[in-house]
């Protein structure tokens, strides 16, 4: 029996996240305070009692979701047989699997968030969810539209998120509706994540990831770029860099984990988005979501 731990990405955040850990677990409180110190601002104030607007800023959201996931895992003392994360969650998975220290993971996540926010401001873009079409059909629609628009998140069968320049994404949504999509709706995100518009962020992050000390994880970490399990630190680093402009292949991560013998999934962090997606990949699999102790 193999137990996989999975970690959400941006979009799962909610005001109040992690507060019970801070209030009830002294070791968790210590880590949250260490995070405030590393980040140079009190992220806990925003996480526990800020506004949705404050929490929604990429530079805040990403470290906040990372902190909730990782501190939750540490409080539970989890020992994963396999790990994976959705987009930002890739970093949470690597820290929980022991490939990266808490401090180094947080520094990279903060750098990634700021680089992505800067890229969004430099080249405004958007993302949209396309529901009810085959992946191949959506890929062909993206290829047929003028301007930058690509498949960005393969979330579950029949749910693919596209990303790119605003006009191109809107044009692809119209074509998707004409092709019979159940829904094609813009997402409330700050930019075109996992698309070529993130190239400046990728260049910004490359050096920081290359210089960060990574170790061999205690279990395979299934990474976003190709949904395969990795334990080699050099390959893990390359995948984290590539991930910024490449799609998140979540459907395929879940399928690969199942075919590699994973029998149980636990999602750690805010919300239960991944729990829902995993059930859509395989309705019979055992999956739970934990956002509080």
Regions found by a protein language model. Give the residues of each.
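Glycine-rich phosphate/pyrophosphate-binding beta-alpha loops
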Residues: 61-63, 192, 247
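A short, well-structured juxtamembrane/interface segment
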Residues: 248-256
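FabD-like malonyl-/acyl-CoA
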Residues: 1-137, 183, 187, 264-293
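Non-catalytic positions within long, well-ordered alpha-helices that form the structural scaffold/packing
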Residues: 177, 258-261
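Alpha/beta catalytic cores of group-transfer enzymes, especially the acyltransferase/condensing modules
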Residues: 10-12, 39, 97-245
């Amino acid at each position: 029996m193999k137990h996989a731990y999975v970690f959400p990405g941006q979009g799962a955040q909610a005001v109040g996240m992690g507060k019970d850990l801070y209030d009830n677990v002294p070791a968790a409180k210590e880590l949250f305070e260490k995070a405030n110190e590393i980040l140079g601002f009190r992220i806990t104030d925003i996480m526990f009692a800020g506004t949705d607007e404050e929490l929604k800023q990429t530079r805040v959201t990403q470290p906040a979701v990372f902190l909730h996931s990782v501190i939750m895992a540490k409080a539970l003392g989890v020992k994963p047989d396999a790990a994976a994360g959705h987009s930002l969650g890739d970093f949470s998975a690597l820290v929980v699997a022991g490939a990266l220290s808490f401090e180094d993971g947080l520094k990279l996540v903060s750098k990634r968030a700021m680089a992505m926010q800067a890229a969004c401001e430099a080249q405004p873009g958007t993302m949209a969810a396309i529901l009810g079409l085959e992946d191949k059909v959506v890929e062909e629609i993206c290829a047929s539209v003028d301007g930058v628009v690509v498949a960005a998140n393969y979330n579950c069968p029949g749910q693919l998120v596209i990303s790119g320049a605003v006009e191109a994404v809107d044009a692809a949504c119209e074509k998707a509706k004409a092709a019979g999509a159940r829904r094609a709706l813009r997402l409330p995100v700050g930019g075109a994540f996992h698309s070529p518009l993130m190239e400046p962020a990728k260049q910004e992050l490359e050096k920081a990831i290359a210089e960060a000390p990574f170790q061999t994880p205690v279990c395979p970490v299934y990474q976003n770029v190709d949904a395969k399990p990795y334990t080699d630190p050099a390959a893990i680093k390359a995948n984290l860099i590539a991930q910024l402009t490449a799609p998140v292949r979540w459907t395929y991560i879940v399928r690969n984990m199942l075919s590699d013998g994973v029998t149980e999934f636990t999602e750690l962090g805010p919300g239960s988005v991944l729990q829902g997606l995993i059930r859509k990949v395989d309705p019979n699999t055992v999956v739970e979501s934990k956002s509080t102790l």
